Each structure stands twice: as C-alpha cells, then as structure tokens.
Design a protein with these regions (language model features):
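Membrane-proximal helix-turn-helix segments that form the acceptor-binding/catalytic region
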Residues: 233-237, 250, 266-287
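Donor nucleotide-sugar binding/catalytic pocket of nucleotide-sugar-dependent glycosyltransferases
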Residues: 1-12, 282-299, 303-322
Length: 506
C-alpha cells in the first residue's frame, strides 16, 4: 500500500530562536475531537503556573481559548506554513487529536519540514510519528502528559536550547506592490530563515513605532521626503542606520527620459517623482539593490555610501506553488510573454517581427500573453493563435506560465532596462519553462547562454534561437531542467548574501 503523499515542503532549519519561550505549534482547524479541550487545559496550566511556554496555532480554533499564552494566525494557505512556522518561532508541533485518524495531512506536512512533532498513541499518524526521527509519542491523553513530555523530552530540549537572537529589522513601505513582495516580503523571509525577526509598516505609521526595538531600518521606494526625514532623524539619535531598497533606475530622470513608456499621460509628473525618490535616497545611509548594474549606477551617483546587492529570490510559498503545477500535454507549441505592466510595450515591439514570422509560418505556434501589454496591430493576422490574460495573482502565475513551452524576455537596449532583474527567467524556470531573453550586461552575468537560457543580441539571433527552441523539444527540456536546478540551488530564501546581512545588522 502506498500512503497518501503531499507535495514539496522545504526543510526548516532554525539557526536560533527569536523568542525566549518554548513555543508549541498547532496546525489546521482546532476542534474538540482534534484535541481542543486538551489544548485549552494546557493553556490554563501554562498561565496558572506562569510557565515560559506558548501555544501557537497556525490556523483557526473552533474551541474558545481565551488565554494570553494562546494565539492563532487565522486561515492560511499550505504554502505559507513554513514561513509561519519560522515567524512564530515554533519549537515543536503538537498533534492533539483524540480521535483515531487514518491519515493526517498536517502530520505529513510537519514531517516534510523536518520539524519535531508529538502526538498521542492513537490512529495512523502515531504509527508515522513512531518511525520519524524527530517524532515523540505522548504516553497519556491529557494536558499534564503533554506538559511533562515537552519538559522532559530530549528532542524538545535540543530544539529549545538554541541561542535567542534579539536582533530585529524594521521595514517601511509607501505602498504594497508586486515589486514590494520581492524586495520586502522575500528579504524578510531571508532574515527569519537566519533567525532574525522583522516588522513591516507603512511610512505613515512609523510615528507609532518604538524604534528602540530595532537594529536597523530598511525603506522601500519611499518618495515622501518629509516623512522619511523625520524617521531618519529619530533613527540617527539612536545611532541606527536607514537603508534604501530599490530595484529600478528611477532616481535620475535625465538618464531615462527617452524611454518610450514615459511619454504616456500617466507619466506626466514622473520627473518630479524621480526627484522625490532621489531626495529620499540622499538622506539614507546605504542602499540595497537587486542587480549589479543598479549597484554600479548608485555607487557612481551616491559615492562614499554602502551599496549591497541582494538579488531577487523565490519565497518558500512561491516555490511550493510552482512545484505543485503539472504540465499539460498539448499538440501546439505555446510561446509565453508575461509582461505585467504596459511599460513593456516597447520591449515586445522589439521582437514582434521575429515572433510574427514563426507564427505565420506555422499555425501550430500559439502566443500566450499576460498583463497589460497592448499587442501590435500586426498580430490581428494571427489572432486565432493568440490567447491573452489580464493581471493574475502571483499565486496563479505559475499555473499560467506552465502553459507555455517557451518564455520570452525581450528588453530594450538602455541603462534603465539593464538595471532590471532576472525575475521572469526565475519564475519560468521554477515551472520548467525555458527562457529566451535579450542580451545585456546584467542578464549575461546571470543566464548561461545555451545552458540554462538563451540570450540574443540582435534580431538575427532572436530568429535563430527562437526557431531552434521551437523545433527541438529535447533542447527545451534540457534548458528548462538546467535553469530549474539552478534556481532551486541558488535562488531560495535560505540563501542570502552575507554582505547584505552584515550591512543591515551593522
């Protein structure tokens, strides 16, 4: 018999603790038959005896437990479990079910993460836990027995004996955007995987923050100068550094003014916006950037200040979402372009001739376009081969990208575009789709041409390499497999540039 299986879950390896308490984790929906009464009794004992123990439920409780030692996250997605485990500094998970179950998905998820787990000696989950090297069987079905187990068990002791890291970083944003997920959420995940906790607030709420609780501040694309100036002044009095995180060349209008999308009416005040960004950058102590090209530009324009590169990486939730996608076999070959915003109209325009040519020559070639891009009128001639999607959530994006056989990443030849990161290559590689991209200094420093992607310096190379990928399925699979392996090794949140870490915590 083959037991139930769940998909990929990353291993959780806590380097240290972020709290001084022993934290018992629960996972899922807590009901009476799932052990809710025992959990309530355990919380009562912890509170009554003033024990340094907390109960943290990743999920929701149907049992009313009104205790300061008990907390719940509320509804969660499966992909969020590893991050929530780290953020709540969970030391050991408890499966408190008093009802014999045939299979427990939550037990399997916890074991896949490599976390210690304890349960009562009933049902199929107990059989799995007995065979697990971090499994603990509680001898009696009672709150007292649970407490004695966590007090005396060596596995629990090893988990809680880790050093407590009190370092903490404050992140400040002006608004939440697609980019802020990469630059803030993923950086926060990198930190918590190193055992460093953080908070994130809006710039308008910083006046409520007790800055003494933090070691440093990271602000992302803030343009509100007066508010940032006040925050910087408070930080300076505490001898605390403020870092500006930025992932686009948007602080020197004269250098980028000729870019096509800036001629749109929605960018009429963009020069003023770039000036505000620059003013905010100037009062900060250092910079965190996403690319080597951006690092070079900032070092030239803000000499004497610290600049560190922290490349965009995939969050644990993003990886889980991507690895659950199943490729669907189809007869046609789909070329995908996942642009996001209309700022990429001119990027697409740069390869329209080569793309139209292959589509007109072969009706079996389809184009899948997602985002706000406005397709050139010439594509009306092949409209039956075109499928379009508007914006989708990042959680849905892997499923959409996986529909493609080839991912397009054209970029205009400008310093603005050279400062952009390899996100689109990474997202496609996660779902085993090969990328063909424009060659510039930045992408050439990342993508290995012919090994884990294709780079094109002119229209002739676009035509040649696109046709090569279309004709050769084994080549597509080879490129995709190499890129996927590299992403899984080098682009995870368990990997972080030590230079970035040292700068933030200096």
């Amino acid at each position: 018999m083959i037991p139930h299986q769940i998909g990929y879950m990353p291993q959780i390896e806590k380097e240290n603790k972020t709290t001084k308490t022993l934290n018992i984790g629960l996972l899922g929906v807590l009901t009476k038959h799932k052990g809710g009464t025992i959990v309530a009794e355990l919380a009562e004992k912890i509170e009554r005896e003033n024990l340094d123990v907390r109960i943290k439920l990743i999920g929701t409780s149907c049992v009313d437990i009104n205790s300061p030692v008990f907390s719940q996250t509320g509804a969660y997605t499966r992909g969020a479990i590893p991050r929530l485990t780290l953020e709540n500094d969970i030391d050991v998970f408890l499966i408190p079910s008093i009802w014999p179950e045939t299979f427990s998905y939550t037990t399997e998820e916890i074991m896949k993460m490599g976390m210690p787990i304890m349960c009562f000696d009933i049902g199929a989950p107990a059989e799995r836990v007995k065979k697990y090297d971090k499994g603990i069987i509680i001898p009696a079905i009672s709150a007292e027995s649970v407490y004695q187990t966590i007090r005396d068990n060596q596995i629990v002791k090893e988990s809680t004996d880790k050093k407590v890291n009190s370092q903490k970083v404050l992140f400040v944003v002006q608004e939440v955007t697609f980019s802020s997920r990469y630059r803030i959420d993923h950086l926060r995940e990198q930190l918590i995987r190193k055992g460093i906790s953080s908070d994130c607030v809006s710039i308008k709420d910083t006046k409520k923050c007790d800055l003494k609780a933090y070691n440093s501040i990271v602000v992302y694309r803030i343009s509100e100068y007066e508010k940032l100036k006040k925050l910087k002044s408070k930080a300076k009095k505490l001898n605390m550094q403020v870092f500006y995180d930025i992932d686009d060349y948007i602080f020197n209008y004269q250098a980028i003014k000729d870019i096509g999308f800036l001629k749109g009416k929605e960018y009429r005040n963009y020069e003023n916006y770039t000036e505000q960004i620059r003013n905010c950058m100037e009062i900060c102590d250092g910079y965190i950037v996403s690319t080597l090209s951006l690092e070079k530009v900032i070092k030239e324009q803000f000499p004497g200040k610290v600049v560190v590169v922290n490349r965009n990486v995939a969050s644990m939730e993003m990886v889980i979402a991507s690895l659950t996608v199943e490729k669907v076999h189809k007869d046609n070959i789909t070329i995908g372009y996942f642009s996001g915003t209309k700022t990429h109209n001119d990027d697409f325009e740069s390869i329209k001739g080569e793309l139209l040519s292959v589509m007109q020559e072969n009706e079996n070639i389809h184009l899948l376009v997602a985002g706000q891009i406005e397709l050139p009128a010439e594509f009306n001639a092949v409209k039956d081969q075109v499928e379009t999607f508007k914006f989708v959530s990042w959680q849905e994006l892997p499923h959409l990208i996986a529909k493609a056989d080839i991912n397009l990443m054209p970029l205009e030849n400008s310093i603005f575009h050279e400062c952009k990161s390899e996100n689109k290559w990474m997202e496609a590689a996660l779902v085993n789709v090969p990328t063909i991209a424009s060659r510039n200094n930045e992408l050439a420093s990342v993508i290995r041409d012919g090994e884990d992607g294709f780079l094109c310096k002119n229209s002739e190379e676009w035509a040649e390499k696109l046709n090569k990928l279309i004709r050769d399925e084994s080549l597509r699979n080879q490129i995709a497999s190499s890129a996927h392996a590299r992403i899984m090794k080098e682009y995870m949140t368990d990997d972080m540039e030590m230079e970035t870490l040292r700068a933030i915590l200096k």
